[in-house]
């Protein structure tokens, strides 16, 4: 039986950008369900969505209750076995879903790809997540996620629907500040970390099939420009602390063991290109 895949596009006041996300979702080389979840947009987003007719499912809520509520609303309305959360300012290559599905197995928790960061005005995009490709031990990726200040984005990953519903938390206990409740900062990291508890392996496609747009209103760029990067990093530290409280969680390797793990990871990534 062919796996069913749903692409969820949460959006808020980005009518100008969301069309690219929708167009690339609809152009996938395998059939997908596309759900656009709009919480409280006051721009032309409803009109933009209407142009696609029955090719997409448009969920409209009049109240904006924050990113994480919008993400979950979209995921809860999917019918696929697998889901991809595609932020409204990002997009994926037409082969993204097909290539990710090829690496899924019963013991693989999720699949993610490399990504390109596009800065308006820059001729060449930066490739990120140069990690070793293929199916690999989950413990390797967990060490990376515990070590790095900023996480892998769900925008370059494919998850099982049941895992997304279980592990995309409405909020993180202890989270506070501007990146606390309902911001999605930390919840995105925990989607990976909590899912890792149930699977021995993950998979990585060593091709940049996801595309992220760096612009003033994107969360990472705005954190840097507003002097709140430390608060952003702290929010992810709270998420890691929550993960470490869970049964079966992995402690971060430190000292010589941590240095060796990091070195081996980087070498494998360089060999992969």
Q: What are the roles of these predicted feature ranges?
A:
Residues 1-24:
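N-proximal low-complexity "stem/linker" segments adjacent to membrane-targeting elements
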Residues 16-19, 43-51, 91, 95:
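Acidic helix N-cap motif at the loop->helix transition within catalytic regions
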Residues 23-32:
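Short, acidic, metal-binding catalytic loop of nucleotide-sugar glycosyltransferases
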Residues 24, 38-47, 63, 87:
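A conserved acidic beta->alpha catalytic loop
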Residues 61-78:
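Glycine-rich, basic loop-to-helix element that forms the pyrophosphate-binding segment
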Residues 83:
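Short aromatic/hydrophobic "clamp" motif used to bind/position activated sugar donors
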Residues 95-128:
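Conserved donor NDP-sugar-binding/catalytic core segment of glycosyltransferases
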Residues 135-225:
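Conserved nucleotide-sugar donor-binding catalytic segment
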């Amino acid at each position: 039986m062919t796996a069913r895949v749903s692409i969820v596009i949460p959006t808020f006041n980005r009518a100008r950008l969301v069309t690219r996300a929708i167009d690339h979702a609809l152009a996938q080389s395998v059939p997908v369900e596309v759900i656009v979840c709009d919480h409280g947009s006051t721009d032309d987003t409803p009109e933009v969505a209407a142009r696609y007719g029955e090719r997409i499912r448009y969920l409209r809520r009049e109240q904006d209750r924050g990113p994480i509520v919008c993400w979950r609303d979209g995921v809860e309305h999917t019918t696929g076995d697998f889901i991809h959360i595609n932020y409204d300012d990002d997009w994926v290559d037409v082969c993204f879903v097909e290539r990710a599905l090829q690496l899924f197995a019963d013991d693989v928790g999720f699949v993610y790809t490399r990504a390109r960061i596009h800065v308006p005005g820059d001729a060449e995009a930066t490739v990120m997540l140069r990690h070793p490709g293929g199916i690999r031990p989950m413990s390797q990726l967990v060490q990376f996620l515990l070590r790095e200040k900023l996480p892998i984005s769900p925008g370059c990953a494919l998850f099982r629907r049941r895992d997304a519903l279980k592990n995309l938390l409405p909020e993180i206990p202890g989270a506070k500040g501007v990146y606390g409740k309902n911001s999605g900062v930390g919840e995105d990291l925990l989607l990976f970390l909590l899912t890792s508890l149930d699977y021995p392996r993950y998979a990585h496609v060593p091709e940049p099939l996801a595309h992220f747009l760096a612009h003033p209103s994107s969360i990472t760029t705005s954190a840097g420009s507003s002097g709140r990067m430390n608060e952003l990093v702290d929010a992810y530290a709270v998420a890691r602390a929550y993960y470490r409280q869970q049964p079966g969680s992995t402690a971060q390797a430190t000292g010589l063991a941590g240095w060796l793990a990091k070195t081996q990871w980087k070498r494998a990534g360089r060999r992969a290109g």
